[in-house]
Amino acid sequence: MEAPDRNLGFLLHDTARMLRKRFDQNARHLGLTRAQWQVLAVLARNEGLHQGALAEMLEIEPITLVRILDRLQASGLVERRLHPTDRRLRLLHLTEAAHPILERIHEVAARTREEAFAGIPPAAREQLVQMLLTTRANLSGRNTTDDEQVRYG
């Protein structure tokens, strides 16, 4: 019999894939692509980032991000502002119109989490989240923070 953690990487990857797929199904009515709502979600936590930093955080190419931002700006959800001291940089900010959409994204995320955690007691959910945060911190060389616990818990 195989050790339970032998296929951990595959299990985590497959579970994350299924979670993304279910979220996409639940969020379809919002009219945003996964890439668009990911940009909005990251900007909500990191208002005022420049495009290069955002691309790095999302692990996408800058040119790909530019196309996503162009669509979000055309939809009135994101604005690019000049950096106060570096004219080459544009700082990214959410517009007021983005906030109600973010609320709906959070509602979809909560519903998706409830579907994923169905049948798992709250204490076990918390334990799972804590173990994943610790595992991620071990691999990234960072300590977990209270902010991360709130964001993922």
Place the predicted regions along the sequence by residue.
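Pre-recognition alpha-helix immediately N-terminal to the DNA-recognition helix
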Residues: 11, 18, 22, 38-41, ...
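Charged, amphipathic alpha-helical coiled-coil/dimerization segments
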Residues: 20, 48, 52, 56, ...
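Residue at a beta-strand N-cap/secondary-structure junction
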Residues: 37, 47-48
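C-terminal regulatory/oligomerization modules of transcriptional regulators
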Residues: 1, 122-153
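N-terminal leader segment of winged-helix/HTH proteins
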Residues: 1-30, 96, 146, 150-153
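Key DNA-contact positions within bacterial/archaeal DNA-binding proteins
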Residues: 35, 63
